[in-house]
Amino acid sequence: CCMSKARAVFFDIDHTLFSHTLHDVPASAYTALEKLKQNGSQIALCTSRAVEELVNLPPKLTALLDGVVCAQGGIIMDHGKIIASKIIDEGDAERVIDYCRRNNLVVRYSGVHGENSHDLHYTQEISDLFYFLYKMRPGQTLWKHQPLVNIIFYTRDAQQVDAIRPLLHNSHLMVMHFANEVTAADANKASGMLELAAHWGFDESQTVAFGDGYNDVEMIRRAGLGIAMGNGCDEAKQAADYVSDDIDRDGVYKACLHFGLIEEENHAEN
């Protein structure tokens, strides 16, 4: 096949590339990333994490990255340099944060420089969740109207989500079971993926996306090749071109092999 193997390959982090049973990237996934790079592919993360929530990723992983779409599309980085920020409408930010202050909801907001913080309310449960996932805990500083790229408010109460929805006039709301995410209207994982790929000179057909969660669905659907992890949610699997094995059963490596994005070890040597 004379078609170039080079692609822009985008990975969700948690439960797709980074295993929380291992607290690391599986060895086979590291092998896949190294081989993708040898084939001229660009490797990027595509995540809801704010920039500060990336600091404790394994150095071996960050050394392999060409770019990151953070804050669910709110910040796009090429080799550590921010090339685009999608600012949430200030009125929307004010209304949602004010609602959360009045209704005792915990908020984590993230600014244009990648900083993250809780606002007025804070619970040990959510702080522990951040520590479990990201090995860091956000500080707590009241929002003072600085530009934001991402707001997460925590509630399991659908009525509270329904009360917040009409407060957002120009923003995108991703409702998850507990962590509900606000971004600018034009910011999501899919748009961030396509913008970074274009910046690198790849078109949509040359993008590959790996994901597992509800917030990965659009990215998986829009990518030239969309792959859901075996441990992923049903919506991700339905959107995918291919469902691979679980993260802890070499899912990333097996999918790369299946589509010829990389070659098996022993055939590579002649």
What annotation goes with each model-predicted range?
Residues 1-11, 34, 38, 269-270:
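Non-catalytic pre-domain segments flanking phosphatase-related domains
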Residues 6, 40, 65, 148-149, ...:
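Short, well-ordered alpha-helix to beta-strand connector turns
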Residues 7-22:
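Asp-based phosphoryl-transfer active-site loop
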Residues 24-123:
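Active-site phosphate-binding/coordination module
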Residues 44, 69, 208-210, 227, ...:
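Hydrophobic/aromatic beta-strand patches that form the interior of the parallel beta-sheet core
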Residues 54-58, 164, 220, 236, ...:
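Hydrophobic packing residues within well-ordered alpha-helices of enzyme cores
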Residues 99, 103-222, 231, 238:
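Conserved acidic, metal-coordinating active-site core of Asp-based
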Residues 222, 227, 232-270:
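Asp-based, Mg2+/Mn2+-dependent phosphohydrolase catalytic module
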